[in-house]
């Protein structure tokens, strides 16, 4: 996992405005319902559901809301047939972009995704065109901790790698299926988890300049505004110097 310690620069997040928060919650609930419907309501035997629960909690969703969504999925109270689809393409500056969608209408979804690429100087690729550049991983963020103690706890919990960041925080990587159990182990050792989610880690990154970086951020914003888009992953990297100019 060496070379990916600047995850805060690699993955862009929009500000938590009220309208955006509502859209995020809608997408989280959709994933909770679908995960429970496909794999059952027990998070210990359904890693996709556990990952969805962890992400919902990290976004401050209440347990009551989470449980209601799971009950909808398990109880069959939602007849919508949602399917996961991943679109791959190229963004500004030759960046690789993966768009994870959850939709009941593939035609509607592609009609939202394709124009986003086109308007930002990118293009939608074929299946497998950039997917080989990414690995599916669990990512746990710790704001601050004693490095030796955290490393020991992370290894004991089954983590694959731990990377200290310049701001004193730590990024812990796991097999995506083990995200829940590793998080539990780290918390049991007394550490506070700031965020835990399943993500896609790029094997190589593309350094963006002051002209290209805003175009990629615009593409990400457009894609995340699409109702059917759950997650956007890319391998663009923005230096602190370029970020200061944006």
UniProtKB/Swiss-Prot annotation:
One of its GO terms (cellular component) is cytosol. It comes from the Bacteria. GO terms for biological process: regulation of DNA-templated transcription. GO terms for molecular function: DNA binding. Its main location: cytoplasm. It is found in: Cytoplasm. SUPFAM superfamilies: YebC-like. Keywords: Cytoplasm, DNA-binding, Transcription, Transcription regulation. Gene3D superfamilies: 1.10.10.200, 3.30.70.980. It holds the Pfam family Transcrip_reg. NCBIfam families: PRK00110.1 (NF001030), PRK12378.1 (NF009044), YebC/PmpR family DNA-binding transcriptional regulator (TIGR01033). Belongs to the TACO1 family. This is Probable transcriptional regulatory protein HAPS_0943. It comes from Glaesserella parasuis serovar 5 (strain SH0165).
């Amino acid at each position: 996992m060496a070379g990916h310690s600047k995850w805060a620069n690699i993955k862009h997040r929009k500000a938590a405005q009220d309208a955006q928060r509502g859209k995020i919650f809608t997408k989280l609930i959709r994933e909770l319902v679908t995960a429970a419907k496909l794999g059952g309501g027990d998070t210990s035997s359904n890693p996709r559901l556990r990952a969805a629960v962890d992400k919902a909690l990290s976004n401050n969703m209440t347990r009551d809301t989470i449980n209601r969504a799971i009950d909808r999925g398990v109880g069959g109270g939602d007849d919508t047939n949602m399917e996961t689809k991943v679109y791959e393409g190229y963004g500004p500056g030759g960046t690789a972009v993966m768009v994870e969608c959850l939709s009941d209408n593939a035609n509607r979804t592609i009609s939202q995704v394709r124009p986003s690429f086109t308007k930002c100087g990118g293009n939608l690729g074929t299946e497998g065109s950039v997917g080989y550049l990414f690995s599916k991983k669990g990512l746990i963020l710790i704001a601050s901790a004693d490095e030796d103690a955290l490393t020991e706890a992370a290894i004991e919990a089954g983590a694959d790698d731990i990377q200290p960041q310049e701001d004193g925080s730590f990024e812990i990587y796991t097999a995506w299926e083990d995200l829940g159990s590793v998080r539990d182990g780290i918390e049991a050792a007394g550490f506070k988890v700031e965020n835990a989610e399943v993500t896609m880690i790029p094997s190589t990154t593309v350094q963006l300049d002051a002209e290209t970086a805003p175009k990629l951020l615009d593409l990400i914003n457009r894609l995340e505004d699409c109702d059917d888009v759950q997650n956007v992953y890319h391998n663009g990297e923005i230096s602190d110097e370029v970020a200061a100019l944006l």
